[in-house]
Amino acid sequence: MKFKILFTIILFVFASLGSADELRNAVESKDRSEKNIVRDEFRKPYETLSFFQLEPNMTIVELSPGGGWYTEILANFVRKSGNLIAAHFSKDSERAYFRNSRINFEKKVKENNLYEKVTVVDLNSELSDPSSVDAVLTFRNLHNWLGPNMDKIFSNTYIALKPGGLFGIVEHRAKVGTSMEAMK
């Protein structure tokens, strides 16, 4: 009996180390751009993504990936056994910045095999089939959604997540006393 318990604990520890190694490999990958690697010192991607306890076989949604800074790491992390869904601005947005951001992101995804497991969807649409996603992540975007968009994005997130799924939010810190109106 003691052997079985010890064996189970050892298996769990090694399984956890495997995920950590795969995450570290994704963060330290030669596939990452120098421009993005320079930001690691400030964004601390290994520590951030480790906190979320992600596994490489997960289906992960990244909300508002922008130029793909975290996408570059996440795509590599899930490449062998998981999936990454990038929920980006609509191609039909009235704002040229949003349209161009989406066009540039899709071009980046199509031109590099690193992104072969990345699917791009509209941020304000269904993210995936209901209860099919292990984790939804967003990085420094929440303040951009203040207002009616936030309700839609949160609702779509809730619908897409599996029971017990993770919604991970990394956000800027406002100065103490900053009003919600000033953050909009």
In which residue ranges do the predicted regions lie?
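A short, conserved alpha-helix within the catalytic core of class I
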Residues: 122-123, 144-157
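Conserved beta-strand signature within the Rossmann-like core of class I S-adenosyl-L-methionine
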Residues: 85, 164-172
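A short glycine-rich, Lys/Arg-flanked "PGG" loop and its adjoining helix->strand segment in the class I
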Residues: 75, 151-166
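Conserved class I S-adenosyl-L-methionine
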Residues: 57-66
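A short acidic, Gly/Pro-enriched loop at the edge of an enzyme's catalytic core
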Residues: 126-136
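Conserved Class I S-adenosyl-L-methionine
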Residues: 180-184
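Class I SAM-dependent methyltransferase Rossmann-like catalytic core
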Residues: 23-51, 55
